[in-house]
């Protein structure tokens, strides 16, 4: 992978937690907004190049490393069970920039809590599972998708797919929020038979085929970004 240490100078302090041990951890860098992980906030830092801007954003949008698992502590731990690896990880103390995830026994109750808090989701893992390093059926990501209906204001034709341009009406204007795609043989493809009109979107200026916004589609998505577009949208059927 890419070395992104220079983008997050505050995370350089994590090396102090090793205390002369050689560690390999599995986790992710997270930025927070209102006490919750925020993908949009992290995006403000993930592509910076100017050193002064990086240092400025370190203060304005601080990040932390969230540790999910430990793969190595002076020796390979990937063949140990999840519970054994968690014990090895728990010996390391949390700091302002290093936070360990916990194991919860009641997954259903935890997921209900996640939904109430508006968090992204959970990962369910078998307690005795070893670390494979790729997707496996005994590690399941359960995402907290939101659902909303959006107007179809147009479409883009691709080789085998149709990408619908989605919008929502605010103050009499159709505001573009993102795209969802279907295969050309999907029954919803009949929507593109409608008569084309001028671009109905207030904030979408790119090329496309435009329609009168009368059809609505039910769409699932993770969250809205800072520019109000949908993150990971897909058509709910």
Predicted regions and their residues:
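Nucleic-acid 5′ end/cap handling module spanning
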Residues: 1, 97-202, 206-209, 216-220, ...
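Covalent nucleotidyltransferase
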Residues: 1-92, 216-236
């Amino acid at each position: 992978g890419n070395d992104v240490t220079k983008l997050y100078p505050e995370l350089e302090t994590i090396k102090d937690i090793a205390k002369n041990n050689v560690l390999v951890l599995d986790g992710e860098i997270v930025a927070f907004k209102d006490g919750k992980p925020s993908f949009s906030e992290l995006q403000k830092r993930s592509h910076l190049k100017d050193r002064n801007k990086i240092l400025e954003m370190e203060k304005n949008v601080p990040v932390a490393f969230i540790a999910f698992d430990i793969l190595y502590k002076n020796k390979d731990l990937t063949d140990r069970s999840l519970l054994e690896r968690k014990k090895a990880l728990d010996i390391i103390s949390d700091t302002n920039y290093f936070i360990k995830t916990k194991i919860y026994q009641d997954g259903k109750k935890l997921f209900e809590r996640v939904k109430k808090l508006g968090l992204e989701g959970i990962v369910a893992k078998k307690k005795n599972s070893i670390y494979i390093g790729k997707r496996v059926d005994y590690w399941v990501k359960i995402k907290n998708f939101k659902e909303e209906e959006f107007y179809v204001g147009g479409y883009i034709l691709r080789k085998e797919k149709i990408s619908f341009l989605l919008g929502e009406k605010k103050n009499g204007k159709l505001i573009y929020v993102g795209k969802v795609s279907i295969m050309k043989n999907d029954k919803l493809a009949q929507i593109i038979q409608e008569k084309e009109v001028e671009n109905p979107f207030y904030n979408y200026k790119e090329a496309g085929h435009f329609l009168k916004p009368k059809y609505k589609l039910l769409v699932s998505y993770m969250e809205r970004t800072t520019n109000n577009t949908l993150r990971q949208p897909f058509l709910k059927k």
